[in-house]
Amino acid sequence: MFLINVWKADFGLDDAEAGRLSGIGIWPFAFSIILFSLFIDQIGYKAAMIFAFAGHIIWTVMAVSAYFVSDKATGYQLLYWGSLICALGNGAVEAFINPVVATMFSKEKTKWLNILHAGWPGGLVITGLLLIGIDSFAKDTPWAVKIGLIAVPAIIYFLMLIGLKFPESERVKAGISYKDMLSEFGVGGAAIVAVLLVLQLIDFFSGGGTLGIPVKLGFVALGVAMVVGFGVYTQSFGRPLLLFLIIIMIPLATTEIGTDGWITAIMEGIAKEQKFHAGWILVYTSAIMLVMRFFAGPIVHKLSPLGLLAISALLAILGLGYLSFAQGAAIFIAATLYGFGKTFFWPTMLGVVSEQCPRGGALTLNAISGIGMLAVGTLGFPYIGTLQTKAQQNAIVENTELQSQIPGLVAGGKVVPVTEKRIYEVIPYKVIDDAKVKELTSKLSVADAEAATKNLTETKDRSNQRALLDMAMFPTFMLICYIVLIFYFQSKGGYKPVDLVHAPTHAAADEY
């Protein structure tokens, strides 16, 4: 998250391509967490932990190597594939830790899942402070050193957990069969996963280019086969409530993970003008999350999980809207609103799923995380990148001084030197073509070209902030959905967790 702009410069990426690199570090998480959730009760939590450790160490080696290879293309491939391996490891971590906590604290799931997920912002705070410190006091430190730091926590958690005995899951204890677990997710859940997975596979094997129709149809057939197979086995569409929560999770993940992944890069131009490190915004909002998640218990008791989520969505809307134009100290006031807004999203949603769909065991609890990460990696990160390019072009159209400096830059209310691209073969976008801009400025005197280029760069940097207003549409959709759920549960007598009725034996849990 803190190195996106560094990698853009090193490997010559545009915003959407940088989003694609961020995405490969996200979406495999979904594949890993869902796959492990299907079999984790059989292979054991410790196996997932060992897999995660291996993934984090391999990523560290590949990423550090990417810095030292002389060929940029090879370095980029090491970074790209290493990010994929790291994401698989991240998914394995959450595949075992979520059900472990839900089992250990079955009467206070939302509270303890919030405390568990304080580790996410905690990691961002520690990493952010380390990297800002390095940038401040040892500016020439290679980014390979920064990436290498990931090996430290990986070794620590491996040594902490390798000798421990993990508990039996809540589902298995209750005697809920494997088929019943899958039935909670159903064909509906499988279809959502299949759509996102097919889009991602098409992009992954296209390498950012295009694939032939037969190959695309092959991936579509794979997705259809997955859904049909799931349906034949479970003979269930899935719980409607769970499917509704899954739909909410897609914009939720984009609001939290997508914005976190881009906010340092988006605010970099403004931060330079205000003379502070852009990383401070992410560190600050993450610090708010870290502290507040430890107090989720009494807040949930006061508001209910859905009330907390609705208020959080409202704060996120206000925070992102304010961040889109805030200047100076007001940036941190806006960031405070956004930080409080995003604090409880992810773990409280997991708590709601675990409390309302406990028969789904590790699958429903982890699959909703997986779908969120798959959505933000497949669509969220690149889409935010396209919002930036759109904001840049709008700012150029509004800058009449810049247009007078570079004749031919704008015509008919549109930026002329652009290149049309398509990410994931789904999202079309236009990016400002630096080579075409250079052709226009080459016709100017050296002094005029330098002044125009400086104006253009500053205009683009400042405009990125505006993209945050467009991102507010995600929590707006979420707020509407949470209000619908609040009224739904009120019609049922209020929000109450579902308790599993424990069977006298565990035999049913082992049936396929």
How should each PLM-predicted stretch be described?
Residues 108-131, 135, 365-388:
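Glycine-rich segments within core transmembrane alpha-helices of 12-TM secondary carriers
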Residues 1-5, 188-216, 230-283, 377-390:
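Extracytoplasmic gate region of multi-pass secondary transporters
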Residues 132, 146, 151-172, 188-208, ...:
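C-terminal membrane-cytosol helix-exit motif in multi-pass small-molecule transporters
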Residues 54-72, 314-327:
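C-terminal ends and interior cores of transmembrane alpha-helices
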Residues 20-38, 283-296:
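Central cavity-lining transmembrane alpha-helices of secondary-active solute carriers
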Residues 382-472, 506-512:
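Low-complexity, proline/glycine-enriched hydrophobic segments characteristic of transmembrane helices
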Residues 73-93, 330-344:
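Hydrophobic core of transmembrane alpha-helices in multi-pass small-molecule transporters
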